[in-house]
Amino acid sequence: MHVPVLLEELILALEINPKGFYVDLTLGRGGHSLAILEKISNGKLVVFDKDQDALDQTRPKLLALKQNIEIIWSDFSRFDFYLENLGIQFVDGFIIDLGVSSPQIDDPARGFSYSKDGNLDMRMDKSQKLSAFIVLNEYPYEKLVEIFFKYGQIPYAREIARAIINSRPLKTTFELVNLVKKVIPALVLVKKNFIKNVFQAVRIEVNNELDSLQKLLEKLPKFLKQGSKVAIITFHSLEDRIVKKAFLDLIRKDKLEFFQKGLPKFSMKVFRPKANELKSNPRAKSAKLRLLLQNR
């Protein structure tokens, strides 16, 4: 069962307007969207996901609750195209949860988990060609080193890349796990689980996650108005750094007007999971919610 992270904090922070317009750019299993639908009456919700399985599983639950909803299969970086086609100019609240969902992690066939043996896949969108299998079996040594350094921050990037080249073809997640265990000393892995970082790096590359996030953040301001909010939940420092910079850039851009009008156009708040949530949902440990508010 997928438990949405920071749900209480997100819903309270959004201060949902019953007549408002909301966009969930990462539907997943619908935890955040279902909570929003319960609070909007004459409003509207548009949801996106690039994982067709997530849409198929969640669509019946959403439509059983309300009909004022649009469900779109797409990477979130293209959200502007769909909103413009729907004639939508402004949005009261955006929700983006950048985590991998529990059903994705728990299904060995998806290849996201290093604790379950399965095919090397890791595609959020199963219709795309690029998969973990292609990355690990076809990328040249230099490219593998780059993604392990850049997306995994792994000091053993060169050694892992060399071992991958020498062990091809790799077919399963456990083959990759065992390879990493042979390369990185056991005492090092006890202190820091670099296997997690290896899987993270490959997943980011397969799904073009950071580039998509950057494109999304560049497009968001166009759809904001006074009172609009953007809630983004991050799970690792790479994506959080990108979100933080984008929000701070908007805040700093407005410095002159702030001194003239006495009210910043944008402000930011940060929320972390409470102790009771961490106890019931260990996967929330690394989660962080950043909220951007347009004040005027």
From Swiss-Prot:
S-adenosyl-L-methionine binds at G30, G31, H32, D49, F76, D97, Q104. Keywords: Cytoplasm, Methyltransferase, rRNA processing, S-adenosyl-L-methionine, Transferase. It is found in: Cytoplasm. Its EC number is 2.1.1.199. It comes from the Bacteria. It catalyses: cytidine(1402) in 16S rRNA + S-adenosyl-L-methionine = N(4)-methylcytidine(1402) in 16S rRNA + S-adenosyl-L-homocysteine + H(+). InterPro entries: RsmH, SAM-dep_MeTrfase_MraW_recog, SAM-dependent_MTases_sf. The keyword Repressor does not apply. GO terms for cellular component: cytoplasm. Belongs to the methyltransferase superfamily. RsmH family. This is Ribosomal RNA small subunit methyltransferase H. The lineage of its organism: Bacteria, Bacillati, Mycoplasmatota, Mycoplasmoidales, Metamycoplasmataceae.
